[in-house]
Each structure stands twice: as C-alpha cells, then as structure tokens.
Design a protein with these regions (language model features):
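Short helix-kink/termination motifs in transmembrane helices of multi-pass secondary transporters
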Residues: 8-11, 15-16, 20-23, 37, ...
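Cytoplasmic-side transmembrane-helix entry/capping segments in multi-pass membrane proteins
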Residues: 43, 96-106, 159-168, 227-228, ...
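Hydrophobic alpha-helix/TM-entry signal in multi-pass membrane transporters
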Residues: 41, 48, 64, 100, ...
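12-transmembrane solute porter fold
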Residues: 14-16, 51, 125, 192-195, ...
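Transmembrane-helix bundle of Major Facilitator Superfamily
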Residues: 1-148, 315, 381-385, 396
Length: 421
C-alpha cells in the first residue's frame, strides 16, 4: 500500500477479490449446468493468470484493486466449476466422495497456507513477486485441464435463452449486502453507515424481485427448485453458519496470537498451520466413514461437535500456553471442518437433479461466503467497539454458539446412504 501510495484503499485489495468471487459463483455454477464445465474451467485459469500478471505490474492502488477484481471473477468461476466437476465425472456418490475430499482439501489448504506463503515471498522478494507465482501454476493447470478433462456437453439447455435479468438481480442480491458488510467493518464505520445499510436493503430488494422473475423464465439462472426440499434449506443454513465460524477463526486467530499474546507474525502463522493442514485428514476420514453410514448426517453432527469443542478450547489460550496445546486445539477445529465442508456440497448434489447440480453446488459455496462476511463483520464491529481482546473472546463465544446450532440443524437433516443414491 505504501509502495503505491494508497493506504486508504488497502482494504479493498482483498475486498475487491472477495466480492467479485462471491458474486459470480452462483452465476458461473449455473452456466456450467447449461454449457458445460470445461470451457469455464479453462477461462477461469486464463483470467486468474492474466489478472495476477496485471496485478503484479500495477502502478497505483486503483489499478491493483481493478486487477484483483478481475482475479476474483476468475476465482469465482473456478470455485463454481471445480466443486461441481466430480458430479459430472462420477455419478456414483461412493466414487465421487473421494474426489470431493481432494477438491475440498486442496481448497482448504490453499486458503490457509496461501496468505502465509504469500507473506513470506513478499518479505523476501517484494509484493510484486507474490503475484508472479500464480501465472505459472495457472499455465500448468490450463494445459492439464485442456488435455485430460473431458468435454461433457449438457443436452437439457440446447437452444434456450440466457436469463440476463435474473443474472443482474442475482448479482445485486448477493453483492450489495456483502459490500455493505465490508463497509461496516471499515475503520470509519460511521462515515459509511448510511451507504452500508442502503446496500443491504438493495440486496434484499433485488432478492425479492428475483423470485418472481425466476419462476417465469424457461431456463432460470437460479432455479428455485433446488431449495424446495427441507434438507436443501437446512444444508445451506448450516453451510452459512459454518462459513462464519471458519473465517472468524482464519481471519482473527492470527490477530489473537499476535496482538494479544505477543507472538511474531511468523510464529503465529506456523501455529495456524494445523487448522488447515488437518482439514484433509478429517475429509479423508469422512470419505472412509460415509459409505458405511445408514444415517450419513451423523457425520455433520460429529463435525460440528469437533469444531465447537475446538472453538471452546481456544478460549483457554494464554500467552503462556504450550505450543503442543495450541496445535492440539487447532487440529481439533480443522478435523471438524474436514467432516463438514465436503459433505455440504456432496449432500446438495445427492438431493438435486443432475441438470441443477452446478447451481446447487455453487449455492453452498455462496452461502459459505455470505457466512464468512457476516461473521467477520460482526466480530470486527465488536473489536472496534470494545477492544481486541474482549472482541475476540466474544467472537469465540459466538463461534461456539454457531457450532451448537449447526449440530442441531444436522440432527434435523435426513439423508439416505450413498450406496442407495
């Protein structure tokens, strides 16, 4: 920010990416249903790679924000397609769950380790170097996807017009409240309060207008039928709350370790590693247990218990807490997330029509993004109004309560065994 003389706009470097990604997940998930995943996967890799190069070449802060938004568009497209691709390739849920584990684990590890590795590269080589790493990975991924990923052409959307009005309303319905929440956690909240509330109201208004529009069009961008079942509503509500817990921990635990307990940024980053490193282990255990469950929703209950226990034990941390204890507690939270995150997507795919599987999967990811924005905003407001220490403690209590609610919701979900799906 100092290098580009734009400290006042610094927060929007991350916010711009997040908003662009969250807004587009649902739209690109549905477009994948209509036109196939492979073109969108290739386009997402190209956009992310080009956006990274342009961001690294930015000469001022507005340019950097604009190119981060471009990256976010590619990121949203990537999330929407990669989480749905296993459903196209493996109609059998027993085989699909293994690949869902790999996808979810890769995403979780990248989300946790990416910022830490980026910080190390920035410290060693400068901030521009952090952006020049991604294009190389994007080129390799583009080649592998182009050569080996099959082109599966949907047949149910042939000749039907794209729902442009629904796409616009959906963009406002998702993006406006998220932008409002981001403004609420800005430093000068009072200066933005009116605009933030206006954005939230605009988002709800667009959502209300979206419903009758989607009921009328032949091929809706957001098919309302994916929310007709009780289970789909409960799964997305649980995903919303879990997203809040996950990002409160990822976003604010480093602040607790550094500002309250006095750890160095490097030490705090290393202590956070178990949270994301153990998620794949939980996902692999989930993949082994899931086919054996007559009531697979019990794994959601197990995940919420582990996650809630980890949040509760996090409140025991002090400046004198031994490293092994911090690792055990954060590993417990990571294990819980490993049981929750892949199952939300898999269960939504299991109860949705094949023609809607992209929209259903994308909805889960969007709800997680909404939950993360809401959770981090509420804790951010608590920190701003009280203090860092007290605000973080309130945030952890909030996480425990959310985990209890997720556990209760999970008991109300009734899923059939994957062997029968």
């Amino acid at each position: 920010a100092d290098a580009l003389d734009g400290m006042a706009l610094y927060a929007w470097v991350g916010t711009g990416y997040f908003l662009a990604s969250a807004i587009t997940i649902l739209i690109f998930g549905r477009l994948g249903d209509l036109y196939g995943r492979k073109p969108l996967m290739l386009a997402s890799l190209a956009i992310v790679g080009i956006g990274s190069v342009l961001a690294g070449l930015s000469q001022n802060m507005p340019q950097l924000i604009a190119f981060r938004v471009l990256q976010g568009l590619g990121g949203g497209m990537m999330v929407a397609t990669t989480f749905t691709a296993p459903a196209d390739l493996f109609p059998d849920a027993r085989k699909r769950v293994r690949w869902m584990v790999i996808t979810s684990a890769s995403y979780a590890v990248a989300s946790g380790l990416g910022p830490m590795l980026g910080g190390m590269v920035t410290q060693a080589l400068g901030w521009r170097a952090a952006f020049f790493i991604t294009p190389g990975a994007a080129v390799i991924s583009f080649y592998l996807t182009w050569k080996y990923f099959p082109r599966i052409r949907p047949t149910h959307a042939s000749g039907k017009r794209l729902d442009w009005l629904g796409s616009l309303l959906l963009t406002v319905a998702v993006g406006a409240p998220l932008a409002g929440l981001e403004l609420l956690i800005a430093e000068n909240t009072k200066d933005h309060l009116g605009l933030a509330m206006g954005l939230v109201v605009a988002g709800f208004g667009a959502g209300a207008m979206l419903i009758p529009v989607e009921r009328r069009v032949e091929m809706p961008i957001f098919p309302l039928r994916i929310l007709q079942s009780r289970e789909s509503v409960l799964l997305n509500l649980a995903g919303l709350l879990t997203g809040g817990v996950m990002y409160i921990l990822i976003f604010y635990l480093p602040l607790l370790l550094q500002d309250v307990f006095g750890y160095s940024p490097t030490h705090a980053g290393l202590l956070m590693t178990p949270l994301v490193a153990v998620m794949p282990l939980g996902s692999m255990m989930n993949a082994q247990l899931l086919p054996k469950q007559t009531n697979p929703e019990r794994l959601l209950v197990l995940g919420s218990v582990l996650l809630g226990l980890g949040c509760l034990l996090t409140m025991t941390f002090t400046a004198n807490s031994p490293t092994w204890w911090v690792i055990v507690v954060l590993s417990t939270t990571g294990l819980g997330l490993g049981f929750l995150l892949p199952n939300y997507t898999l269960f939504m795919q299991m109860i949705s029509d094949q023609r809607d599987v992209g929209a259903a999967s994308a909805l889960v990811q969007t709800m997680r993004s909404l939950g993360s924005a809401l959770g981090t905003a509420l804790v951010g407001i608590a920190i701003a109004r009280i203090s860092v220490s007290s605000g973080l403690r309130i945030g952890l209590i909030f996480c425990v309560v959310l985990c209890v609610v997720v556990g209760w919701i999970s008991t109300q979900i009734k899923m059939k065994n994957v062997n029968k799906s």
